[in-house]
A protein has these predicted regions:
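Bacterial N-terminal signal peptides
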Residues: 4-16
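Non-transmembrane domains of secretory- and envelope-associated proteins
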Residues: 20-26, 35-37, 81, 126-131, ...
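Extreme N-terminus nucleophile/cap motif
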Residues: 24-52, 57
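Generic short beta-strand segments
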Residues: 31-35, 58, 135-139, 188-192
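Beta-strand-rich interaction surfaces with strong enrichment in secreted/lumenal proteins
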Residues: 43-44, 121-123, 174-176
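An acidic-aromatic
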Residues: 46-104, 111, 122-163, 169, ...
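Short secondary-structure junctions
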Residues: 117-122, 246-247
């Protein structure tokens, strides 16, 4: 069975599992529309539950499902056609704040996360907004590194980041807009690469949902939530069916999982 292509598409969705690691996350479901030049529009479905997130995506008639359980720090990739699944640990990089609100004011954003430690360095002004400055250290084998994150004290989103490779990110609040009937804040994110190259991403943050519901990236990439339905999500959406068989993750992220080839 071939997991890799569809798995990469799910990872490209504008939702980080960080969204479900925060305090008081609202449960809801939504459709995500994605479009980019010279490619067919893509539609996926997302479900946000109690500390868990599920994403369904169909490409060329093949559906894949990803379930992330942040309480257990575990991610599952399901192949309904083959009735099989892969399982892995949800790494620190997946639960760092990014486009989603995190812990309550002054709370340690790394609390409960394996191989990730945070040290509070104080409060600084970032584009006119008070932000907590945190040092985050990843101690995972082969992935050690340190980054500095400034968390907006009101929204609990990262408004500035300094990454180990020298890249930086900075957010600036543009204003407030109504999008699909929901009150949002429009933010402009500027990313600077180590060589000095810059690009800008526009994001529409929904304070009630504590996450972005629209994003526009360079090159014409647009992603937007629609048909948002707030409410308790069924627990069985976030469990692996008992008749599914576990297969191994391919070495080096190869195209095939397990030993049986493509189903």
């Amino acid at each position: 069975m071939r997991f890799t292509i569809l798995f990469s598409l799910i990872l490209s969705l504008p939702v980080s599992p960080a969204v479900i690691a925060g305090q008081g996350q609202i449960e809801f479901s939504a459709v995500i529309d994605q479009s980019m030049p010279q490619q067919e529009p893509r539609e996926s479905k997302i479900y946000i539950g109690d500390g868990r997130m599920r994403t369904d995506i169909t490409v060329n008639g093949k559906t894949m499902i990803q379930i992330v359980d942040m309480k257990q720090q575990t991610a599952y990739m399901l192949d309904p056609a083959g009735q099989s699944y892969m399982v892995r640990k949800a790494g620190p990089g997946e639960v760092m704040p990014g486009g989603a609100s995190v812990a309550a004011k002054d709370a340690n954003p790394c609390a409960g996360m394996q191989n990730l430690g945070c040290t509070r360095l104080g409060v600084e002004d970032v584009n006119g907004r008070p932000a907590e400055k945190w040092e985050m250290v990843n101690t995972s084998p082969g992935q050690s590194g340190k980054m500095i994150v400034w968390l907006d004290q009101e929204r609990r989103i990262p408004v500035r980041q300094s990454l180990p490779d020298g890249s930086t990110m900075e957010m600036h609040l543009i204003g407030r807009e109504t999008l699909n009937g929901r009150d949002t804040e429009k933010w402009e994110m500027t990313v600077t690469r180590p060589g000095g190259q810059k690009y800008v991403v526009e994001q529409w943050f929904d304070p009630a949902l504590k996450m972005n519901i629209r994003e526009e990236r360079p090159g014409g990439f647009v992603s937007e939530f629609r048909n948002i339905k707030v409410g308790k999500q069924p627990a069985d959406l976030f469990t692996v069916p008992s008749d599914y068989k576990e297969v191994s993750i391919p070495q080096g992220g190869g195209a095939e999982a397990g030993q049986g080839g493509e189903h």
